[in-house]
Swiss-Prot record:
Its EC number is 2.5.1.78. The gene is ribH. One of its GO terms (molecular function) is 6,7-dimethyl-8-ribityllumazine synthase activity. This is 6,7-dimethyl-8-ribityllumazine synthase. InterPro entries: LS, LS/RS, LS/RS_sf. Catalyzes the formation of 6,7-dimethyl-8-ribityllumazine by condensation of 5-amino-6-(D-ribitylamino)uracil with 3,4-dihydroxy-2-butanone 4-phosphate. This is the penultimate step in the biosynthesis of riboflavin.
Amino acid sequence: MVMSEIQGQRIAFIQATWHRNIVDRARDGFTDAIVELGYPKDTVDFFEVPGAFEIPLHARRLAKTGRYQAIVAAGLVVDGGIYRHDFVATAVIDGLMRVQLDTDVPVFSVVLTPHHFHEHAEHVDYFSTHFVKKGAEAARAVDATVKSLKALPTS
């Protein structure tokens, strides 16, 4: 992609602040990778929400502005011992899929739901590293999908 194809295109990155120390790492991985792919750093607008459950509504509102060519969502949904996490994770992923299908703006998920997570150093370190990787993967997926969609016939 040449720089003239990138100019003026925006990407929204929505991040839950629950477990911020870990979820911030997805933002870091995404930002580093998107810049490596040739996008100017200021192409990405960052938005924060309290938790993952709030992400789909924000994604929908941002998609409807027409300003964004892609939206990325990042969050960590953990099992707090009351089986709620499965319902939250499903609602978030289903909501994100609906946003992209309803608005025609691609939405990428770095909302992760580990089988086991505890607030101890080993898990925090593991998931922090994993979120960097997933953020970078999301950047590459954004780039590939945006290019692919632009190549499709419009009528």
